[in-house]
Amino acid sequence: MKSLGRAALAVLAALGLSAAPAGAQATDATVQTPADALAQDAGEYAARYGVPIDEAMRRLRAQEESVAATDAIARRFADRLAGVSIEHAPAFRIVVLLTGREPVAEERVLAGGMAVPVVYRTGASATRGQVVAAIERFQAEIRAAMPHAPSFGLDQRTGEMVVTVNRSDVDAYGHDAMSTDLTLTTRVPVRLRSVDRVGDLSIDGGARVVGVSAVDGRRYACTTGFVVTDGAQAGVVTAAHCPDALSYIGPGRRETPLTFVGQWGWGYQDVQLHLAAEPLRPLFYADSPKTLVRPVTGTRSRYTMRAGDFVCHRGERTGYSCAEVELTDFAPSGDLCGGACTPTWVTVGGPVCRSGDSGGPVFIGTTALGLVKGASYAADGTCNFYYYMSTDFLPRGWSVLRQPQPVPVTPPAPDRR
């Protein structure tokens, strides 16, 4: 797939990679420890929710350490589960939405040094699986019936299928009439959300590599996300809608050609892979001025993402920012995935995203989550949300390169002879 979205921007400056050759990373930035990385994200959390920094640190640790618990809850209530969400105000807690009326008592999960409340709400009219199945079954039919192709996604807070439609279509059809028709068609609860545009972000993203487009012959900049490996060699990934022939821009604006391996841009993927002649380390830029790089110590599967999860991204146009996950199981509008997109993308709330952030890394602490693909904008250019491809969908045989973690050494038992 070679979709440039809206008009891509010509290269204005050469500014270094998110995932860079080892030499460039070592000279350009300080490597954070995992604790430093989490503290940086906690600063954003504290500012957003008005809590002390130590409380923000506890909550972010609890958010990540509670994933195994919510996965177990999802398995336990597999036939009733409509969604799992994280609430940050007025207090930090986990909310589980179930179908049926049988109540479930509140529980507590020990995570991050906190006893996190788990609250169960009942009465949802469809399970997560039923909503996703409805998106897959009726997406093409609904797209064909509307002047502008809508997008679809699951809101795990409410258990609803959120249909994001063009504002002009809602005005012409009527909000209530459209909502009723979609609910009757899909047989699951539907909520409409009207926007002006959902599409790919411009190919001028989270950090710079440059190349010439085969479509128009112009020179463009694009982004890289994380360093990846197949076990024998390492490469960098970026968005599939970038030029194939790319060069890394290093210190002094020195260009180092990257070797194109392949691209995958259909349905659930938007990724291409390049190899570099220089050695690569599992680091990525995570601050706006590119003075700090983080190691990658782990990844997190798309299916474990919960509405309300607090995540961060870095884009060349917008720098570093953090916000909440909104929709999981999201299918972007139009033919942005070499045809219709599958409901496998994840959206994150705005307003900090702009044309130019495509391909940038999405993460929390030192955990890699995915690569930014596109966004939705209001008429005034404000970002409603961006959406990303999970690291689950990297090319077959490739995975995110991780920094080895020290193995705790247990001292020998004292000799009591």
Task: Go through the PLM ranges and name each one.
Residues R193-R417:
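Terminal interaction modules at protein C-ends
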Residues D28-Q32, E55, R417:
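Polybasic, low-complexity, intrinsically disordered segments
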Residues E107-G113, V119-V236, S247-G265:
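Non-catalytic extracellular/periplasmic "stalk"
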Residues L15-A19, L97, V163, D357, ...:
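Primarily hydrophobic membrane-targeting regions of prokaryotic envelope proteins
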Residues M1-T27:
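Secretory targeting and sorting signals
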Residues L38-Q40:
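General marker for long, soluble alpha-helical cores
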Residues Q32-D36, A47-G50, M57-R61, S66-A68, ...:
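Short glycine/threonine-rich beta-strand-turn micro-motifs
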